Design a protein with these regions (language model features):
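Conserved catalytic cores of very large enzyme subunits
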Residues: 2-204, 238-245, 249-557, 562-669
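A conserved hydrophobic secondary-structure block that centers on an alpha-helix together
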Residues: 199, 226-237
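Low-complexity, highly charged intrinsically disordered N-terminal segments
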Residues: 201, 205-208, 216
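Secondary-structure-rich domain cores
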Residues: 216-223, 561
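Structured binding/interaction patches within domain cores
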Residues: 220-221, 226, 243-246
């Protein structure tokens, strides 16, 4: 394997990160369970959640690897995957599956099977959020979920998909704690019926502040302890500087470029240790956040580009050390990856509308180019004001063919965010995160609820709502394919089925939203999300400035080609009958070579600049958008759509019969 990294230190750290086998770490689960046993019913739920993080950070195993400059791991070591039984309590069989499966496996210590069986399952099996969710869902929701009509992100993970703002570089957690106390002092218990609940939430935030500061204090002490034993003078100085950095952050705001990177990483650990949010916390506009520290340190003579790049590459290793929480069942099938989808935005424009490219932007491109890691994901925002030099350098990195950076249009992002009700300033500070989703960084809870299998719903439409794969009546009984005399009649039935399943999905999502708001607040994430402190409300309870829920439509190309095949061949050209097509689908096209050739090769297709197909695509998209976007959610915001599959098209295809576009049964959409 080719070694990568700017110097020997980074090469060694990168190699360790890439070569280390991901493994299950139960330390967090055991600590959290003890906290619940001690404090459940004594503390309010927000305070209990703050205490969980505090107890974990006060006792967790510390790790400073050889040569590390940025410190902190979510678990006991690189590639450790803590479990979150309060969300999803895995069975012992699940643990064996994680350990034994060929792909995306997590090794489990022999003694941890017994801990899971004797401690975790008895305490968490019935009280986990996953169990609460499944008890609360309707039979219609459960059937649709189990048969692959849609997935549910919150079934094994927490709401997340949020991004950092400049705020964490302007304040330390002592400052946040003072802000929280000021908000408590302003509560009006005479006139505000929510004052008591707000106080509980704010007290939980104070405990979360204590948690992250304890972690910093412990790392400062640990670095000094290692420095005392270190015989290499260069490394001793580095360890003492790490200790000095941890004396400052996270309790106080960072003063240097190195401290700013360490501050971000402590915050990242706080968010992803509190719960396992889908997707993980992202740095957002890291180049713009770090550049003031870079410029000051260069001016003061304590930083050069070589050191600045080295520190970035150490941060890249930290991202790659954190595998996504282990998944099982449908959740594994819908997103089978180690990556946790942290995503960096580089370039774009500043909050006042000027060119946002700076010296750190180029360093980040160099870092991407040298590291080529699975995590973090990286993109560049390209605006009308982006220098050609930056665009050219980004293209040089991208042309090497490893998928990064992705390219996004800044003006389109801003327009999309403003269309969704964001202010111009908040839109300019925003960007993309996770896969391709846009959001107002630091100001928005934009939570993904799951994938929606549009081609599967068309399959049900052709069969009177009946699912041949599972042998169940899932949809509305609106007629069989041969009953629809015109394409318009068929499409109207298809729309009714879409709305029926959207109603089921969104009703379930509203209930799930309330379950998380009541039972799984996230006081730490709430601290660093704008407006939660001033409102006294949790991120999971509507505290953010903007609260958006997304439902991802999957299979837009497949459904376009399916509808095109039916409209073009059955209704327009009459090259075969609907009955002949349905028989071909039932036979998985075996013995139907003529029909298969026609639908695959002689029919207008999506993505070919063919208005016949494109007009169908637009009609499907607009209907799906009209039925989702604008629906109110339970947090005072609205639902919106995305169109993306990640890896869910593989799972969705597996639960389907053959499709009219020539896709064979069980093949990806």
């Amino acid at each position: 394997m080719e070694e990568r990294g700017m110097n020997e230190r980074v090469k060694k750290l990168r190699k360790l990160s890439v070569d280390t086998q991901p493994h299950i770490d139960l330390e967090r689960a055991k600590s959290m369970t003890k906290t619940y046993e001690k404090y459940e019913g004594v503390l309010s739920i927000p305070e209990l959640r703050g205490q969980v993080l505090k107890d974990y950070f006060a006792t967790k195993t510390l790790y400073i690897g050889e040569g590390e400059l940025i410190v902190g791991e979510k678990g006991d070591s690189p590639q450790a995957a803590p479990t979150f039984p309060e969300l999803c309590c895995h069975t012992v069989e699940d643990m064996h599956v994680m350990n034994d499966r060929d792909l995306i496996n997590f090794k489990v210590k022999e003694e941890d099977y017994k801990v899971q069986e004797d401690v975790m399952i008895p305490y968490w099996d019935k009280r986990s959020t996953r169990s609460r969710i499944l008890r609360a869902m309707t039979p219609e929701w459960k059937k649709a979920y189990e048969c692959g009509i849609f997935t549910e992100f919150m079934e094994q993970r927490g709401p997340g998909h949020t991004v950092g703002s400049v705020k964490i570089y302007e304040k330390g957690f002592l400052d946040y704690k003072a802000d929280i106390q000021a908000s408590i002092d302003k509560l009006d218990f005479m006139n505000d019926p929510e004052a008591f609940d707000k106080k509980s939430e704010l007290e939980g935030m104070k405990l979360a502040c204590d948690a992250i500061m304890i972690l910093g204090e412990r790392y400062a002490a640990y670095a000094r302890e290692l420095a005392e034993k270190e015989t290499d003078e260069t490394r001793k100085k580095e360890l003492l500087q790490i200790a000095a950095n941890c004396d400052v952050v996270p309790a106080h705001k960072p003063q240097t470029y190195w401290q700013a990177i360490q501050m971000y990483w402590f915050v990242h650990l706080g968010v992803t240790s509190e719960l396992n949010p889908w997707d993980a916390y992202s740095p957002g506009r890291l180049d713009q956040h770090l550049n003031p520290f870079y410029e000051k340190d260069v001016e003061d003579g304590i930083l050069d580009d070589e050191k600045a790049l080295e520190l970035l590459e150490c941060l890249w290793v930290k991202f790659n050390n954190q595998p996504a929480p282990p998944k099982v069942g449908i959740t594994l099938k819908e997103s089978s990856t180690y990556t946790d989808f942290a995503n960096l935005n580089t370039g774009g424009i500043t909050p006042n509308g000027e060119n946002g490219v700076n010296n750190v932007s180029y360093l980040i491109l160099d870092c991407m180019d040298e590291m080529k890691l699975l995590q973090p994901s990286s993109n560049v925002q390209i605006s009308r004001k982006t220098p050609q030099k930056f665009l050219k350098r980004a293209c040089e990195v991208s042309r090497k063919g490893w998928g990064q950076p992705a390219f996004y249009n800044t003006e389109a992002i801003i327009q999309e965010l403003m269309n969704a009700g964001k202010s111009l300033e908040d839109a300019r500070k925003g960007g993309t995160s996770g896969c391709v989703e846009t959001g107002a960084f630091g100001n928005e809870a934009y939570i993904l609820t799951g994938y929606f299998n549009i081609p599967k719903i068309f399959e049900l439409t052709l069969n009177n709502g009946y699912d041949k794969m599972s042998g169940q009546q899932l949809g509305l009984e609106l007629g069989y394919a041969t009953d629809f005399e015109t394409y318009e009649d068929l499409f109207e039935a298809f729309k009714k089925q879409i709305k029926y399943f959207l109603d089921i999905k969104i009703q379930g999502s509203n209930v799930i939203e309330k379950i998380f708001a009541e039972y799984m607040p996230v006081p730490f994430l709430s601290i660093i999300t704008n407006d939660c402190i001033s409102r006294g409300k949790d991120y999971n309870g509507g505290g953010a400035r903007y609260n958006t829920k997304y439902l991802q439509g999957v299979g837009i190309g497949t459904i376009t080609d399916c509808l095109s095949a039916v409209k073009y061949n059955v209704y327009d050209k009459k090259t075969f009958t609907m009955a002949e097509l349905m028989q071909a689908l039932d036979d998985n096209f075996e013995g139907h070579d003529r029909i298969l050739n026609l639908v695959r090769n002689k029919t207008p297709k999506y993505g070919n600049d063919d208005d016949y197909a494109d007009d169908i695509m637009k009609e499907v998209f607009e209907y799906y958008r009209s039925q989702v976007t604008g629906r109110p959610n339970m947090l005072g915001g609205m639902y919106r759509i995305n169109m993306l599959p990640t890896t869910c098209h593989v799972y969705f295809g597996d639960v389907m019969m053959a499709s009219p576009n020539g896709r064979l049964a069980h093949k990806p959409e």
